[in-house]
Amino acid sequence: MQDEALDIFDEKQNPLGVAGKAQAHRLGLWHYAFHCWLYRVVDAGTDVRLLFQQRGPDKALYPGLFDISAAGHYRAGEAVADGVREIEEELGVEIQFGDLVELGTRAEVFEAGNIISREFCRTFLGRTALDPAAFRPAEPEVTALVEVPVADGLAMCAGTWPTARCSGVRHWAGRWRQYESELSLRDLVPRPAAYYLDIFRHVEQASGGLRERADEPPGQ
């Protein structure tokens, strides 16, 4: 398989040229990534959910952990709007770039083994009417799609609750099956809790707000 070509930059986002993805990760070269969080309004004001994907077991970074709804690298020469191809590639649905809300660009550095990933992450928020079973995830790259109620996520990320409920679909024994569980921050790709809290707050605001918060943590 041919190595993907990426535009690379210095730490101040000045362009330096083009490198293969493997080289960029080996040398820790800065490049751009597309991050898109998708949410669904089940019942306005009371039931709003944020979509997470579970990373496949063969992922070089953080296999098995839950991550952004859809994300990936910008290829060399791509424009900002071209990042939406990641949604179709990973989730099997098409979303228009104009329907997304930009949340800003965040620098992320992850290191594992021989990989040094340095990314400028262009982050977006989008609304979907689809529940997890309606997506067509790219298995084995994605092994589960789950929704977390925003009220639960806010409580977990603020440290009020240890876990948040989640429900969706998981690939097991050759097919996609309904799945319900609980997630803690340890189940998510390691980012500051404040990052996830900020995303849940953006969803709460974009959806028009929550009239009430659940007052008991999962399992109670």
Tell where the protein language model's regions lie, with residue ranges.
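Acidic, metal-coordinating catalytic segment for phosphate/diphosphate chemistry
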Residues: 1-44
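Residues that flank catalytic or metal-binding motifs in active/ligand-binding sites
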Residues: 4, 32-34, 70, 102, ...
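Conserved Nudix-box catalytic region and its N-terminal flanking loop in Nudix hydrolases
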Residues: 23-35, 46-90, 160
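Short, solvent-exposed loop/turn segments that connect beta-strands within catalytic domains
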Residues: 41-48, 113
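A short coil-to-beta-strand element that immediately follows conserved catalytic motifs
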Residues: 94-104
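Nudix hydrolase/Nudix homology domain
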Residues: 104-111, 115-220
